[in-house]
Design a protein with these regions (language model features):
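Helix-start/capping segments and mature chain N-termini
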Residues: 2-217
């Protein structure tokens, strides 16, 4: 939704609200190799903004400058993705993804008080974990816990479920995607492709004109 026209100035209340929906083919956001083998991440020097500055739980385009700065820093340093810390130094999220760690078989995520986006894919992982008999624990995660975790993975609509194999040049676990990450990755793929009957209500079929399908092929 946007209030991008109608009035000049910083008060948008008299501007009309429009909704724009764009759809296009998109491959693996962090690369097919990253999705299969894991990505290399770096803890960014840019902190995630706090709730007293903006609304971190909301997906608003104006808030992405924070993430853009972290992403640019990370890519220039030779890594695939950034991990951002909250204002108190605890783990918050990736530049465009939520983050989870696995320790002793337990799935742990930062709490919403760590300025995390209330992501749809994050909620999906909660439900898929519950379906498989697991729970997701929300608690503060210290930066140092990233380095000693058995597994780390990220989630997002674009990224889907992506393993993290290195953080700040430290190998995570075995250096390969772990069993919990793989299980959730497979469940996510099954859910979004309609292969889990109980989760078909998550999907909305979209009719693609035959001409568009022919053009893609």
């Amino acid at each position: 939704a946007t209030r991008g026209y109608g009035v000049m100035g910083l008060n948008p209340l008299d501007a009309p609200v429009d909704v724009i929906i764009a759809v296009w083919p998109w491959g693996a956001y962090l690369g097919e190799a990253g999705k299969q083998d894991g990505i290399r991440a770096q803890v960014s020097s840019w902190r995630r903004f706090g709730g007293d500055t903006l609304i971190p739980h909301a997906k608003a385009s104006g808030q992405y400058l924070n993430s853009i700065l972290a992403k640019i820093e990370t890519v220039r340093a030779g890594y695939d993705e950034a991990i951002m810390l909250a204002q108190d130094g605890s783990v918050s999220e990736g530049s465009g993804e939520n983050i989870f760690v696995v320790m002793g078989g337990r799935i742990i995520e930062p709490p919403q008080t760590a300025s995390v986006l209330d992501g749809i894919s994050r909620r999906t992982i909660h439900q898929l974990a519950a379906d498989s008999g697991r729970t997701v624990e929300s608690r503060s995660i210290a930066r140092s816990e990233l380095y000693i975790a058995d597994e780390v993975f990220m989630t997002g609509t674009a990224a889907e479920v992506v393993p993290v194999r290195e953080i700040d040049d430290r190998v995570i676990g075995s250096g390969q995607p772990g069993p919990v990450t793989r299980e959730l990755q497979e469940l996510y793929e099954d859910a979004v492709h309609g292969r889990i009957e109980a989760r078909r209500d998550w999907l909305d079929p979209v009719e693609v004109p035959a001409a568009d399908l022919a053009a893609e092929s």
